[in-house]
Amino acid sequence: MDKCLPPLRNYPSKARTSFATHLNTVLDATADCLHRAGVPAPARIESTVNGVQLGQLPTFSGNAGACTSAGLRDAVENWGELMRYARCADGTACLGSAAGPCRGVLLFGGERLPGGQPRVTDADKLPANHYLESATLAALSSRQLGGLPNRVLIPFASRNEPASTDVAVCLP
């Protein structure tokens, strides 16, 4: 007699106890890489508001620079679409956060919000507001990130609910 397992969709990745830890490790390593690289300009700058440039992650070279780890490159390849990166255009620590002043911030967009944030076509995947919540964009505009979490937190009770809260990791 064959035993059938329920469909894989019944076991979302976030249901694994190691999921939040894995994502936090990826975010910490990526933030460290950006910091060691001197908080470089974002790739494809989407906007500059109140002196803060917002765009996509710069390309991490596999052969040189701060991001030579194959594990980091693989993780960024897998999760980079959900990340955005912002920095103070003048190089100062113009962003305030619970961790202190920041020259930049690595942003990780949570699951898409119901009824919005399309991410199907290549064009859908470009706008930051298809990944980041309006509260995150407002925090960037005001240069105050203190109200945003700096870690991925998935409490056991909500593992089957959308994890839509964005994460902001300060780059001092």
Named regions from a protein language model:
Residues 1-172:
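Short, surface-exposed interaction loops/tails
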